[in-house]
Amino acid sequence: MTPMSENNGSENTRDVSAAMMKSRSNSSEYAGGDGSFHASEVESQSSQGASGGNTSASKRRTKASRACDQCRKRKIRCDYDDDKGVCTSCRKNGESCAFERIQLKRGPSKGAVRGHSVSRSISGENNNTAATAVGSGGEFSSPSSRQGSVLLPPLGQYLPQPAPVPSNLNATQQQQFWKVPYHDFQGQRRGSIDSLSSDMSAKSVNIPQEHLLYASPSAGHPPLHSPVTFGPNNSSTDSGYWPFRNSGGEESDELRRKSGSNPPSLKNVSQPPPPPLQQQQQQQYSYSKFNNSFAQYGANGFPSRHGSIASEGMSPSASVPYQSVPMNQSNSNGLSQQQQQPIQWPKVQPKNLPPPQVQVQAADKEETLGNSFQKTIKKRRTVSASSGENKAEPGEYPLARFSSSGNDSLLGGNLVSPAGFVYGQIPEIQLIDIYYEFIHMVFPIIPLNKETVTNEILLVNTQPISPIHEINNYVILWFRNSLELLIRITLKRRSGHFYDSLTHSKERELSNEIRGNSNGGGSNDSKDDNLEMQGVFVTALNECLQKIVDIHPSFRENKDKISPKVKIIYLSTFVLLNYILAVVGYDNSFVLGMSTTIFKDFKVYELLLYDDEDDDATKSGSNDNDNTNNDNNSNNANNDNNDSRFYDENNAMNWDQAGYSITFKRLYVLLIIFDSLQCCSYGGPKLLNVPIEGASERFFQTKPHSNSKWVVDQSPTRMKFILQSVKFGELLAECSMKRRSICDLSRTQLTWEIPPYFLKGVTDEDDELFSLAQLLAAFILIRKEFVDCLLNLQDLETGELPTVDMELCGELIKLLCQLTSIILQALTVMMRTNPKNHIDYNYRPMKPMEHDDSGNSASRKFTTSQAESGKNSGNDFYHKLLGLQDNAEACLTNLLRGSISPYCISMLREIRNVMELVKKMPASLIGVVMACAGTHHNTANNNNNDPLAITFQSQELVVKLSNCMNDMMQITSLLNMIKPVNLSDQDSDNTSATATITTTETISKSLNRDHSIMRRLYYSKAAKRDKKHIYPSSSSSPQLQETITTLKSFVLIGWKLLDDFELGWS
């Protein structure tokens, strides 16, 4: 070939490359999301075309033009190759090359300028203004769709940008009244209609399977520093202002069925943007439920969202299924200030590459931009983008957790509070579902049924038209966070301690992952780690209390303007925090004290004491409610009253005043129960001395022909369990108010009588006790009767002991056997229902099968599959060993399986104390019975009576004592197996039984010594009355010395049981 032909070939090549450049610059296939393309690719193509004729002169680059992030951190050479897809260093370390670091450039690249020009031309503006628009950061260039190109985030969103003054929209364009709790952002930048269309067109070009939502800067709110990316199988089918939500189509449909009407999507990126008027019409959402409330807004303030069309699509509150780590919040002085830290969002890579890797990043802006000298290793975890991997297991709510497993998907953003607790790992609608499935039927923290709560109470106006609605927003936020705190600490973990994932720590996550992979499960944390995590829990609890208390001054100033719905949510939050303390067994009187103060300020006690209109409280408006519920969807034209009630809160408050009143009474009763529980568990005086005897029947029981809107639960069977739990709380209140150390100041009346109201519930219900609360109530009653019997063995004034005969021994043995029997039944129910007292999705409560024969009766017939599922749960060997596998068809405890109880830890501590004190009594009583039998046998021979009757009676008593000892052995075994969620982790230890005794010495030593606080108080009072206490001597007593010593030990046990009850169980 001649030189001329070579030159012609070279020129032809250059012409071809130039034509390719020109055609590709005008083609949307080569352009990125905004019509831009990389200048580096054009330069490489032109260089190849220029040197196409001279192959010897062309030199391909053998090394990467840019080192990957891992090699740059280690400051080593990177030999990344497009063919291999990974460099040598990353392959040895088992990592993948990532090019996520943003290069610090002085200005935008040519690609960004060109891309911006194209997007501006689409929106109808001049191309000459592209250079000035890049500086404002309004548009971003997207990477090319070419597979070999390096995906780099746009530079413009990392540049510091001022917050423009928001433009004013027409008042008619804003929705007048929202029933959906959502959050607004103050100072949110509003883009024009043209910029909105260019944004949406840029997102829909060449990226058919992705959503790119960009965060814009706002006053007081640092901008999000990366685009939010949705996977190809996680299209946003529903929208709202909660970022923590499932993204799959099936899961969205399931949530929509659970919550009613979810609002439609903010925008459809697969279609061109609608006109501004149509967009404004789409903004008028249907009234949603609790899940569409307020999204990510500052925990320390009341920022607001302006009603801008553009701000909705670009605000941080848009739906984010794969949001990784939230913005950290810091305390601020004002309620309208918020400090957040930037987060990094995951990216979508081509299908032939590994799944996207999400890097947990909690650094500030400077560290995000340029700090490459960080020494800590940042943990990466894999999040699957396929629908099969994102699908949760059947019957299980997918909890977003920090895990490297592909089956564990991140459902949403995790809001890291200033206390270090990570909020937002469970979607809001699932929080409500979990509460009503596992918690409500044992103890109704929210004393209303699920339908009323989701359709009425939580539908609060939160549109930022006044400070009242911002208060509503704030109250709903911390109610939601408190509910999540409860569910998170009671949720069963797959491995590790139950405090895992409470805090956001990269190093702890990495160490837990390595430990879990190596050990195949959880490992025992050290004491220092336990103390640290306990401190995190206490800090998170105190933070929830502090936040909800901080709003009280504003609440008090506007109490006449705030809706009763918000008041119910506000007071329920305090009940919820006290419930958390009871579940984990933590003594924090400050939470109860602040709750008592808030309830007192609301004057709720006046309703409980001076309002007797209880019978008519739930009957008002029953017919109207039923009619409006039945004809709400079909006869909208004839439901003017229903519409005015839905929108006019004043009319709703007047119509439902009786329903709100009885709800407030229920909340006050629940707070009194927690006050009584804390008084019995930890001692000390009561803070609320309002009597609540009969409150379960007055305020909680469903009455005939009552309005179903205000009932606690729709199911009669579940209502039966709720009433028994509340009635047990009434018994605790009665016992705490009748304590001898407070009521009997004269020290003359050592015993007191139980009201017949409490005895009726135990003896007249059913032949078989099946509810845990009912068994615990029976345990308290039998325990009191047993203590009274022991204290009556010795006269309080003279100290004389009675004559020991078979009748006295029979009474003691009967009460002791009843006590151990009821303890065994209670522990058996605990073992059957929930031995860990935590939430397990694989161990759900059985749904009752109701029938309408008697109105409030429940069927006790269960299907075979349900019975078998109840039998196969747990460890079969121990169930057979302890006799726990009874016929499930005749046992209603299957309805309570998996449910958690606030009484569990407190009652377990008391059971341990009682068992530690009475464990030696059966052996001692056997000796007393044999001695009495010998004495009576000699007396019968002298009086010519039948000695066989006495022998038979003594043998019967010995058999009962032997069975009692057998029950004690099973009780000890069950106490070792039942280990509920506990803050201190000491109650589950075998050696901690004596740690909860109120005396300063162990039981074995204190039994041999005359030591009892209550005994010292009573005997000192008797000495002041000039009646000296005289111990009977062996010569004055007809009994043997050993029998007298045994009776004295029994009396001392009675005093110590009284000490335990008066001074606290813990």
From Swiss-Prot:
InterPro entries: Carb_Metab_Trans_Reg (IPR050797), Zn2-C6_fun-type_DNA-bd_sf (IPR036864), Zn2Cys6_DnaBD (IPR001138)
Compositional bias ranges of the Polar residues kind: 1-11, 42-57, 118-131, 139-148, 260-270, 314-327, 855-871
Main location: nucleus
Ranges annotated as biased composition (Low complexity): 328-350, 622-641
GO cellular component term, pick one: cytoplasm
GO MF term (any one): zinc ion binding
UniProt key word Hydrolase: no
Keywords associated with the record: Activator, Cytoplasm, DNA-binding, Metal-binding, Nucleus, Repressor, Transcription, Transcription regulation, Zinc
Highest taxon listed in the record's lineage: Eukaryota
Annotation: DNA-binding region: 68-97
Location of the protein in the cell: Nucleus; Cytoplasm
Family affiliation: Belongs to the EDS1/RGT1 family.
Task of the protein: Glucose-responsive transcription factor that regulates expression of several glucose transporter (HXT) genes in response to glucose. In the absence of glucose, it functions as a transcriptional repressor, whereas high concentrations of glucose cause it to function as a transcriptional activator. In cells growing on low levels of glucose, has a neutral role, neither repressing nor activating transcription.
Protein name, entry field: Glucose transport transcription regulator RGT1
Organism: Zygosaccharomyces rouxii (strain ATCC 2623 / CBS 732 / NBRC 1130 / NCYC 568 / NRRL Y-229)
